């Protein structure tokens, strides 16, 4: 029920406010799924051997997935009517 959720106003937020934790297990599956969902077919996001050949320890998350997780965090904290304008 959406009425249970409140959107924070600027007056309710201050620089230095402590934000709640958001625990997300970052797995290879999440990294690969995020890359495929955003149509990012660069092999370093889904092929461990290619990532290692590039000097990386494993596949790594693409920027769009990172941004999506940050937007999720911000809007979960700030409320359903909040809009993320920039990160």
Regions found by a protein language model. Name each.
Residues 51-87:
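Hydrophobic beta-strand-centered segment that forms part of the acyl-chain substrate-binding groove
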């Amino acid at each position: 029920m959406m009425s249970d959720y409140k959107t924070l106003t600027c007056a309710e937020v201050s620089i230095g406010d402590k934000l709640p934790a958001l625990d997300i297990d970052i797995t290879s599956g999440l990294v690969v799924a995020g890359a495929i969902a955003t149509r990012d077919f660069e092999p370093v996001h889904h092929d461990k051997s290619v990532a290692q050949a590039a000097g990386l320890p494993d596949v790594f998350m693409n920027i769009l997935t990172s941004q999506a997780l940050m937007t999720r965090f911000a809007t979960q904290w700030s409320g359903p009517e909040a809009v993320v304008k920039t990160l």
